[in-house]
Amino acid sequence: MHKKHTDLGEQSEVEVYGARVHNLKNIDVSFPRNELVVITGLSGSGKSSLAFDTIYAEGQRRYMETFSAYSRQFMGGMERPDVDKVSGLSPVIAIEQKTTSKNPRSTVGTITEIYDFMRLLFARAGEAYSYVTGKRMERMSEDQILNTILKQFDEQPINILAPVVKGRKGHYRELFEQIRKQGYLKVRLDGEILDLRPKMQADRYKIHDIEIVVDRLLVAEADKKRLNTSIQTALKLAKGIIKISDQANQEYFFSKFLMDPESGISYDEPQPNTFSFNSPYGACERCNGLGTIFEVDQASVIPNPKLSIMQGGLAPLGEYREIWIFQILKALAKQYNFSLSTPLKDISQELIDIILNGSDDVLTVPVAYNSWNVKNYQIEFEGIIKLLEEQHERRGEEAMADLENFRSIKPCPECEGARLKKESLNFKVADKNIYELACMDIAQLAAWFTELETRLSDKQNVIAKEILKEIRARIGFLLDVGLNYLTLDRTAKTLSGGEAQRIRLATQIGSQLVNVLYILDEPSIGLHQRDNNRLIAALKNLRDIGNSVLVVEHDKDMIMEADHVIDMGPAAGVHGGQVVAQGSPAQLMKAHTLTTDYLNGTKAIEVPKKRRKGNGKTLVLDKASGNNLKNVTANFPLGTLIGVTGVSGSGKSTLIAETIYPILNHHFFRAKKKPMPYGSIKGLEHIDKVIEIDQTPIGRTPRSNPSTYTGVFSDIRNLFVQLPEAKIRGYKPGRFSFNVKGGRCETSQGAGLKIIEMNFLPDVQVPCEECGGRRYNRETLEVRYRGKSISDVLDMSIEEAVEFFEPIPAIYRKIKTLQDVGLGYITLGQSSTTLSGGEAQRVKLATELSKKDTGNTFYILDEPTTGLHFEDINVLLGVLNRLVDHGNTVLVIEHNLDVIKVADWVIDLGPEGGAGGGEILFQGTPEALVSCERSHTGRFLKAAL
């Protein structure tokens, strides 16, 4: 057993009294502190309601209470959860599955702070190299400069020059005047020494180099004092750089800063922000540190070059109308001598570039307000895309999204995707620059840092000692949570929910906080069985340093390794919300609950008696090479249940979500997203559509609910319109909608609730006093079908609705599928925002199932078992098998062995993640996979079969 950390006088348990959030049935529950506690139970049984909406919400609210009332009103309310009392609570940190930020500047390196420590390492211990000659840069003290000049130019006449302008245009009248007033007599302009005279100026449009001639002297030991004074003056004038020219007009540079003595380029002293792509001091100026640039995609803007601009040849603009943008194009046509009626294919490419991207010339645009009032506007034309952007920005985000269709993302030509200035990329530690390190996967990076001391100088080792300790610790934690295949430059928005969550977990372990209650939501998502033990060890590590760890989890290993388990149930939704068993895993096994039945083998997901062979047709993807895929060829037998497996990072999502799905989506629905590179695809003619079912919420507003999402609400409204009472009153379907005026309660605008703003207290939702929470006005509610009003129907659970609507096939079919996927407990009008990820996914599944079946559909599900209990998985597999039995193809990306063992065909990728993956190790039946030596999946599947 691990050592317990309990302070004297401290409560040893977290106690929750009277929890009633969502479906919790006024429960009292307690669990030990400083232990690993798992909450398990069916999807919808109240696990998240207890862990996140009660315990975490209360901890968060207490933290908010510490702020002043004035600050709280700006923070948005933290509602007090519906619970009588929570005691023994430490500060809470929740690590959820919500994918991290959509910010393109957020990367694995910045989230874990490894990149920040690497910036510090490069700023303090990096060596600079010239980007011109590749030689190591030097810096000298004033004494070293003096001694070098004495030695190198002994008994030779030299000019001591202070460079003040390097490679820039301008007439520099003021500069020459300023130098003259300081008492200098000569300057060197573009290599030629000239006398300074009043009103002197250079050619304004040429690029110039200007140096002040500080002194001309014969170098000799006797003149050392004069030489020293001149050097110091020149260094001051030119901010630390001086130039020497000898008799032969050869030039030599010296600097107090980092400098290349051959080419004369110098770098500023490196600071940590020199290596930050989020700082103007480090970011590449072309792409502002993003590594990519948007380019106008000419083919999308001009899809049909046979049309003229008047006929709508420019897709974003459409046909000619009397609007400002066309007035500008008229003026442009006049200036460049072309016609808006000419087909675009007959206009030169040079002019097309000007139309799209603009030019430096000033345009005169005449605008006629009426026949006698014409005004001329002078504008700089920046191209139609830029103009549209400005207009769209005023119209909000959706309009900006339309514009994305006309632009494509390309790697920045300046930094080639490295995000940094060339100066920053020429600082090296042990022959690697910071971008080269950011491109290594975590496993390679760990190896590189292990041997680093032997490759550094003594001075570098002293400086780097503490930094290396921090970097190694953080890399170690990433390895512990199974993320060895990620690279530091991977952007946060490309991470899956499970990866993002485990990165946050590694960051938390890295912070080494103690006396905290961590609450995690299924950290094993997207994690292969192989890495499970490491994850459990990482959670135990958090516990052993003195924290409480509360995990919502369905994974068998995690449940059995916990110190304490809370099993919620007995069923889901209104039938759940109670603690059916709790205690150590050993105590739990003695109880009789759905969970324990699956744990001790009383119940199990059966292996099918025989595998389906499919319909004999195959979809073949050839030579897929996106991300880490190594030119793989994948066979998808149609009419089967296909499982795509492999360790995390082996290339499953690249193969399916980024290659196969975009290809099919483009083929059937002309979708814009480009697939990753591949050779060819055969067999598309055997499929008639593709459907992807993921776990994103089905609606983000309280007005969205299962009946509106599945479309059954329209049928129900049409039914109510057919009723005699509705016909007499002349009601249309809109009368029964709570989203439009007419039949809804106008006081609450059909929400049934009023939100009362409480300034610095959380907003309070109260039932609307007009309709009493029923959403509709009195007249609408008077129309009844079999004694029920439209509001009563929305309050029915799916189970009740199935019985109620049995006589009406159109409605019955849609509601029955919701019951078939195991959602009998939710109500028709339940707000989508209250559904869990697993529930939302099943609403989508039911929606697809209720559609007329063509029997040739290709379904793609990415980890459908997320958030599902063993019993839920059984129900889900029943649904998927039904789809396949109708002739459809169902493809699941999955780690769950219960799903893999019932698949007809398995495609296993690997053998490792990242660069070590990307091969297809095996394609065939689960039985044959077991004997594949290189496959980690096969090893674990053996036990399941």
Go through each PLM region and give its residues.
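Conserved phosphate-binding elements of NTP-dependent enzyme cores
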Residues: 1-945
